[in-house]
From Swiss-Prot:
The lineage of its organism: Bacteria, Bacillati, Bacillota, Bacilli, Lactobacillales. One of its GO terms (cellular component) is cytosolic small ribosomal subunit. Keywords: Ribonucleoprotein, Ribosomal protein, RNA-binding, rRNA-binding. This is Small ribosomal subunit protein uS17. It comes from Lactobacillus delbrueckii subsp. bulgaricus (strain ATCC 11842 / DSM 20081 / BCRC 10696 / JCM 1002 / NBRC 13953 / NCIMB 11778 / NCTC 12712 / WDCM 00102 / Lb 14). Part of the 30S ribosomal subunit. Belongs to the universal ribosomal protein uS17 family.
Length: 88
């Protein structure tokens, strides 16, 4: 029972699409904050994730939610869950 619950706990991130030039693939930038261990100042850093977009729905500038999944290629480890906000 606990093994199946542990398996389904996957990371879900929300970020901004910065590239949709590849077929069925988007690049999402996720901004997060980290506290400095000594000075306790919050610093912002970002990381890019490649995600599977099966229907090519997401466009550059959209705010999307992505979920961790099995490896789909050499770099893709996430898939598109939904589009939170469309760009103008």
């Amino acid at each position: 029972m606990s093994e199946s619950i542990e398996r389904n706990r996957r990371h879900v991130y929300q970020g901004r699409v910065v590239s949709d030039k590849m077929d069925k693939t988007i690049v999402v930038v996720v901004d997060t904050y980290k506290n400095h261990p000594v000075y306790s100042k919050r610093t912002r850093y970002s990381k890019k994730y490649y995600a599977m977009d099966e229907n090519n729905e997401a466009k550059v500038g959209d705010i999307v939610r992505i979920m961790e999944t099995r490896p789909l290629s050499r770099t893709k480890r996430f898939r598109l869950v939904d589009i939170v906000k469309k760009s103008v």
